[in-house]
Amino acid sequence: MSLDLPPPPARGCRSTEVLKERGQREVFCGLTGIIWLHRKMQDAFFLVVGSRTCAHLLQSAAGVMIFAEPRFGTAVLEEKDLAGLADANAELDREVDRLLARRPDIRQLFLVGSCPSEVIKLDLHRAAERLSAHHGPAVRVYNFSGSGIETTFTQGEDACLASIVPTLPATEARELLLVGALPDVVEDQAVSLLTQLGIGPVRCLPAHHAAEAPGVGPNTVFALVQPFLGDTHGALTRRGARHIAAPFPFGEEGTTLWLKAIADEFGVSADTFEAVTAAPRARARKAVAAASEGLRGKSVFFLPDSQLEPSLARFLTRECGMSAVEVGTPFLHRGILGPDLDLIAEGPVLSEGQDVERQLDRVRAARPDLTVCGLGLANPLEAEGFTTKWAIELVFTPVHFYEQAGDLAGLFSRPVRRRAILRREAAE
């Protein structure tokens, strides 16, 4: 059966030499992952062991007031903690005791490291083991780092899920595991498509509740829905699970190839695949064509932010008619992103890490039609006449699978359209 997709390029970018940069970075820390994880995991609580700056970041980013009792909070390290004048472990134990007494619905507690806790070498791994022994089995305590010293933006989710994997129950069952946090409506769409293909049981990590945690074993196969889950990928592989490599489900082509890789793994017939995917594929294609009209023939430059960049570059170049000048990403995991890189025609610079001043020099030299970058860089670039897209929106907006393909294209076309309108108004 032909999938009716454009042929792959003669030479992709998988073997392209990567420009590795290790300079000043302009990116959020891994604590920001808590913003979407606390909404997804409904019996979990994320306790950041950090400073008031950490608390302000989370409260501002989440858009909630602390008296609304969200499923996250900050155990603030005071000056006496930082100076070693107080027993930080004893203070932490007291805070956890108070929290669990006040919130008996908590079944998973994550101690999240920050820059201050890293600086004073507070051993949160040992603290998690101690608190799990004290409060278990009703509450399991995990730890991971969201420190800006160690992590960037989406790595917080990766560290969180990787901390869960060793505790998942063992199973010999043949199961498909979808790995990565998605909005509920998008996750439901994915599971529905897979169920219609006759694939199951389908389990998800992270689960909504601790009691729904999936098992993992040698008969588990897993598909990533987010490209930034390198540590989680490694943890699952060590448990015996096998990764189904595929482009990520952004746009019509990415979603089709992602589903096809899973369908082939489970022996789904070509006729069944066509019957299930034909209608949503047609809707996605139509939506992308309409939303990307203003993008065709234009160039895009990705500054590193979320690790979604290679997959999105594939979407823009293959489905929206753009050309990529540079695809920058905080970390490039070829084992995970290889199928996407195969579909990006040779030509753009691939860069890993960041030296922000040098990258900005390359942006100014290339003069791309659209620059995808972090919040802190967007306004200065706009002031210089560049058209920018906030990279953070691509993480917080539902953009996966067929029904969101048009919305994804629209996120890129809106700033281009806005710039064109402003130019017309200025000319008048």
UniProtKB/Swiss-Prot annotation:
It comes from the Bacteria. Its cofactor is [4Fe-4S] cluster. InterPro entries: LIPOR_BchN/ChlN, Nase/OxRdtase_comp1, Protochl_reductN. It catalyses: chlorophyllide a + oxidized 2[4Fe-4S]-[ferredoxin] + 2 ADP + 2 phosphate = protochlorophyllide a + reduced 2[4Fe-4S]-[ferredoxin] + 2 ATP + 2 H2O. It is an enzyme of class 1 (oxidoreductase). PANTHER family: LIGHT-INDEPENDENT PROTOCHLOROPHYLLIDE REDUCTASE SUBUNIT N. Protochlorophyllide reductase is composed of three subunits; BchL, BchN and BchB. Forms a heterotetramer of two BchB and two BchN subunits. This is Light-independent protochlorophyllide reductase subunit N. It comes from Cereibacter sphaeroides (strain ATCC 17023 / DSM 158 / JCM 6121 / CCUG 31486 / LMG 2827 / NBRC 12203 / NCIMB 8253 / ATH 2.4.1.). The lineage of its organism: Bacteria, Pseudomonadati, Pseudomonadota, Alphaproteobacteria, Rhodobacterales.
